[in-house]
Amino acid sequence: MKYLAGDFDVVVIGAGHAGCEAALASARMGCKTLICTMNLDSIALMACNPNIGGTAKGHLVREIDALGGEMGINIDHTFIQSRMLNTSKGPAVHSLRAQADKKRYSERMKHLLEKEENVVLRQLEVIEIDVEDNEVKGVLTKNGAYFTTKAIILCTGTYLKGKIIIGDIIYSSGPSGLYPANDLSQSLLNLGINLRRFKTGTPARINKRSVDFSKMIEQPGDEKIVPFSFIHNKLDKDQISCYLTYTSEETHKIIHENIHRSPLYNGSIEGVGPRYCPSIEDKIVRFPDKDKHQIFIEPEGENTEELYVGGMSSSLPEDVQIKMYRSVPGLENAEILRTAYAIEYDCIDPQQLDLTLEFKNINGLYGAGQFNGSSGYEEAAAQGLIAGINAVLKIKEKNPLILKRSDAYIGVLIDDLVTKGTNEPYRMMTSRAEYRLLLRQDNADLRLTELGYKVGLVKEDRYNKFLNRKKNVENEIERLRNMQITGKREINEFLLEKGSTELKKPISLYELIKRPELDYFKVEPLDDKRPSLSDDEKEEINIIAKYEGYINKQLEQVEQFKKYEDRLIPKSINYLDIKGLRLEAIQKLEKIKPINIGQASRISGVSPADISVLLIYMERKDREN
């Protein structure tokens, strides 16, 4: 029987990575917030890989942190290994990645919600969204509880009509054996919301005692641990290693012999899977020329023997899986603790949302995370944060927070989802950001903390720390610009030792740092007035000095790009001739044949980076003609 159970400013449905950020943002901005979850023990659950960050995803975590979100702080408290990726490349693609103790990560996030003053946390299933005159009024639960509210944020993850698939075994379920949410989808359809089916998958978990690590390559954490959160100066921890192995010829043979039993290829799976995270059987079919694929063996925590077999997700039958996993060097005697599976679920076409993540046709209804067609914990958390912020700003009748593509990876993520839509689970990549040298992970606070402070998420002590860092960086750059270095004998000897050339005339230390063979750290012996700075401040100063020309060029591009919206594309263009275009972009452009740059830029799978490549090609052709 239906009964009135309470009144809230904001109701968040789902307590995964999107839901947690949405609820914490809403509560910390002063709104009374209800967060509902199917199971209190699955809050911030890492249903797939036990890590946070990675290429482009690390940028998102830093941006979440800079705006006042929780993910970066939580992983800093619960990581078991930390690595900075892509260090051999430029700073635009440096990405922090941390292995998580997945249970502690979940427990700490749950405890935060329990302690948060404006949060009420409940284990219950929402089955209906109540809307009158295109405006949300409340939610109804399976137990009959009705909660009135001004805003609802849907963060349902993979639970909506979730269906687990292992070979020919198919059953209704959420991730990791949890209950699915089978009733809410119909309520959304009744509201005129378009739903679709997506699919994702996860590999098996195996027992550590059954693994022969001597046949694998050890991957320890970095000696110097870099925090995700800007509030942490230094982290120390005994880290746990991951291990690298590869599929074998036998692995590929087993998969080929049983491919007819794969739900991916026999029609059992209807949902669209993630292009950039394919199952092992999909990889072997799609890349027949590759004789081996990387497999990462990753610990799931400090107090468990479970290991995650990264790179080997599958929906093959269990008997095939056992043979397949045991064909991998080091896994010959692997004990499978949890079988790999695929999961299908309902989600929306995100083009039904506007850039605030509110539904265009329903006031007060927001979507975030996998519900919006994205994949990944970090993408979900970023959307949850923005949806939570904007729900509160609307309640308070303030202007929304809309991040542009030139502001943040979060801006790229949301613009791609909302403007272009997606026909497959969307994953953030550095190649999707056309201004990635401006959107580095090291400067996320300089880009976004001011905004976080203005909306009320970044508190005074955090803001003062940010202002101090900003001032230190600006003052040091100014000092370097004004400090003149002359061609004294000892200075020229120092430069020659470093493989640089002698000075013929005075030069600022700032300009000297720009030389390819030098940097801010190497010129320290020439700088007796150098102030005491933190490691991250020094790194920031070095990047700004070294890449100033490129950074200024991208700032100009931000303004210039607007001019090309209506630029016509020649009918005779051959996209295969354009170096730098990704294969996916070539396929989509060839198929749709857009008539102008504006149309091309809105095609799903064609990134703004691809558009930049296309424009450069067209301009070169114009000059040649």
From Swiss-Prot:
It comes from the Bacteria. The keyword Cell cycle does not apply. FAD binds at residues 14-19. One of its GO terms (biological process) is tRNA wobble uridine modification. One of its GO terms (cellular component) is cytosol. InterPro entries: FAD/NAD-bd_sf, GIDA_C_N, MnmG, MnmG-rel, MnmG-rel_CS, MnmG_C, MnmG_C_subdom, MnmG_C_subdom_sf. NAD(+) binds at residues 273-287. GO terms for molecular function: flavin adenine dinucleotide binding. It is found in: Cytoplasm. Its main location: cytoplasm. SMART domains: GIDA_assoc_3. It holds the Pfam family GIDA. Belongs to the MnmG family. NAD-binding protein involved in the addition of a carboxymethylaminomethyl (cmnm) group at the wobble position (U34) of certain tRNAs, forming tRNA-cmnm(5)s(2)U34. Homodimer. Heterotetramer of two MnmE and two MnmG subunits. This is tRNA uridine 5-carboxymethylaminomethyl modification enzyme MnmG. It comes from Clostridium botulinum (strain Okra / Type B1). The lineage of its organism: Bacteria, Bacillati, Bacillota, Clostridia, Eubacteriales.
